[in-house]
Curated annotation (Swiss-Prot):
It comes from Salmonella arizonae (strain ATCC BAA-731 / CDC346-86 / RSK2980). CDD domains: RraA_family. It comes from the Bacteria. Disulfide bonds: none annotated. Transmembrane segments: none annotated. Its main location: cytoplasm. The gene is rraA. This is Regulator of ribonuclease activity A. NCBIfam families: NOT-MenG (TIGR01935), PRK09372.1 (NF006875), RraA_entero (TIGR02998). The keyword Cytoplasm applies. Belongs to the RraA family.
Length: 161
């Protein structure tokens, strides 16, 4: 499904939170949306592998990487796993790498930067926790919508039809 965050903001202005414009699109989908699962990890993506092995239909993995751009939390291998398991998208408050490969995948990926250095894979981090970045507090179960214009968040799903 295609989402237009500008239109959604016009319709649901009182019901959405708008994330500060920190993110760029790195994935093959220009827009995506779904119910979020939150993760908090710093320069370590081991936990992301565990979560992205699950079926992600209708879901978005939202990762608070502390805003670090020293190590990429998502690479082509991890994004391919997410695509295989039908995740709608990934929002990374941190960095990604292998961007030419990422843009070929049928998944939405928003992140703050790209860097060639990969993350550790020890599995250090937490999932289903409250995270805050970009002026918005995120909870697992919230609904996120993203496109090239921005990212918005709603407690409840928005009626898109």
């Amino acid at each position: 499904m295609k989402y237009d965050t500008s239109e959604l903001c016009d319709i649901y202005q009182e019901d959405v939170n708008v994330v500060e414009p920190l993110f760029s699109n790195f994935g093959g989908r220009s827009s995506f949306g779904g119910q979020i699962i939150t993760v908090k990890c710093f320069e370590d993506n081991g936990l992301l592998y565990d979560l992205l092995e699950q079926n992600g239909r209708g879901r978005v993995l939202l990762v608070d990487g502390g805003g670090s751009v020293r190590r990429a939390l998502v690479d082509a291998e991890l994004a391919s796993l997410a695509t295989q398991n039908e995740w709608e998208g990934l929002v990374i408050y941190g960095a990604v790498r292998q961007v030419d490969d990422l843009e070929e995948l049928d998944i939405g990926i928003q992140a703050i930067a790209a860097i060639p250095v990969g993350a550790a894979g020890e599995g250090i981090g937490e999932s289903d926790v409250r995270v805050n970045f970009g002026g918005v507090t995120f909870f697992s179960g919230d609904h996120l919508y993203a496109d090239n214009t921005g990212i918005i968040l709603s407690e409840d799903p928005l009626d898109i039809e």
